[in-house]
Amino acid sequence: MSKTFFVTGTDTDAGKTTCTLALLQAAAAKGLKAVAYKPVAAGCEMIENKPCNQDVLLLQKHSALPLQYEQVVAYSFDAFSSPHIAAEESGVTIKLDVLSEGLSRLKKSTGADIIFVEGAGGWRVPIGNGHFLSDWVKYENMPVIMVVGARLGCINHSVLTYEAIHHDMLPLVGWCMNRITPSMNHYQQNLETLKSLLPAPFMGEIPYINKPDEQDLGKYLDISTLL
């Protein structure tokens, strides 16, 4: 049976996709069949006359098994905005059971050892009709991996995100630090503070890298606590 983990971030552009690629590569290095799923993606570009989300394409490319675009994502919207706004503009209602059906089909069709489910935005991103994406994560009872985007304010964002996950009675099974800029004042002090405040395994640091999707990212994360 597939192990499933939800990857959330401390904010939009914290580096969820970069971290998910690293997780996929780290799992592959251990001989595991790992694939990715993104329940909701907002922001598409025309590629070969088809609207596609770049994050979904990267997850599709780096999954250990061949997947169709539609297997990786349940809802893909054109607008670069919060999912609930993108859905409303498209005249679509995001349904939790559709998210679950997509995940279930992926499990059955691939027989993957691990599925990394990448969220959208932060933990409390709304998806419409009074629901948050975190409501679905809670319904699926998924363990959570948190990506901390290294920027001023990340300590507050990280602690608040952890508290929200804990409030939802879900386990934070690991977290990583992702450097989203070449330099950050007091980076090491921020990292050490987070290590002392977050009661979850520290999985590693992903350095600032140009074109991270073309690099070996798996070496930066220790996934032993997930296995």
UniProtKB/Swiss-Prot annotation:
What cofactors does this protein use?
Mg(2+)
**Residues that coordinate or bind ATP:** 13-18, 55, 118-121, 178-179, 207-209, 214
Task: Provide the reaction this enzyme catalyses.
Answer: (7R,8S)-7,8-diammoniononanoate + CO2 + ATP = (4R,5S)-dethiobiotin + ADP + phosphate + 3 H(+)
| Matching NCBIfam families | bioD
The residues that hold Mg(2+) are 17, 55, 118
Q: Which Pfam families match?
A: AAA_26
Keyword set, alphabetical order: ATP-binding, Biotin biosynthesis, Cytoplasm, Ligase, Magnesium, Metal-binding, Nucleotide-binding
Where does the UniProt annotation locate this protein? Cytoplasm
Residues of the active site are: 38
- Its domain of life reads Bacteria
In the record, the note on similarity to other proteins reads:
Belongs to the dethiobiotin synthetase family.
The protein, known as = ATP-dependent dethiobiotin synthetase BioD
Main subcellular localisation: cytoplasm
Q: Which gene encodes it?
A: bioD
Which example biological process does GO assign this protein?
A: biotin biosynthetic process
Query: What does the UniProt record say this protein does?
Result: Catalyzes a mechanistically unusual reaction, the ATP-dependent insertion of CO2 between the N7 and N8 nitrogen atoms of 7,8-diaminopelargonic acid (DAPA, also called 7,8-diammoniononanoate) to form a ureido ring.
